[in-house]
């Protein structure tokens, strides 16, 4: 994995300068298999298939505390707003945290994201068009 490519993709995600599909493409090209966004530690960890890990900060200020319970409807609404209306990542982050998301893992090869709340409750969302018929 190339740390400079990952750092640039992370920065571009936070400031909204490139769309999510382009971020995924760049990360996969540099060997990222999955990433873990941690809203408590305010960092994202990027993992390769060989076990290499690169961490970048989430440098947003004044984020709300993670809500006590995972509100799947509010989370799904935030996800759809990002997918369909190009919602800025900062806004998505705030809405996800208010919906009780403590963190999530984006499985790039698997084309899905699993979100979880403070009590371990989970929600998995497929990348647009990637959900198999049997899922």
What residue spans do the PLM features occupy?
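Short, solvent-exposed interaction modules
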Residues: 52-104
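Short, flexible domain-boundary/linker segments around small modular repeats
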Residues: 1-23, 28-29, 70-87, 131-135
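Glycine-rich, aromatic-bearing surface loops/beta-hairpins
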Residues: 113-135
């Amino acid at each position: 994995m190339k740390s400079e490519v990952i750092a640039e993709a992370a920065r571009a995600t936070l400031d909204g300068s490139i769309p999510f599909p382009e971020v995924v493409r760049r990360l996969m090209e540099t060997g990222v298999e999955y990433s873990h966004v941690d809203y408590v530690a305010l960092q994202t960890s990027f993992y390769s298939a060989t076990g290499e890990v690169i961490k970048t900060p989430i440098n947003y200020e004044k984020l709300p505390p993670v809500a006590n319970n995972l509100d799947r409807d509010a989370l799904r609404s935030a996800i759809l707003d990002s997918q369909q209306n190009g919602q800025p990542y900062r806004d998505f982050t705030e809405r996800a945290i208010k919906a009780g998301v403590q963190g999530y893992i984006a499985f790039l090869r698997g084309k899905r994201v699993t979100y979880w709340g403070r009590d371990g409750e989970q929600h998995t969302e497929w990348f647009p068009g990637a959900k198999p018929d049997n899922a």
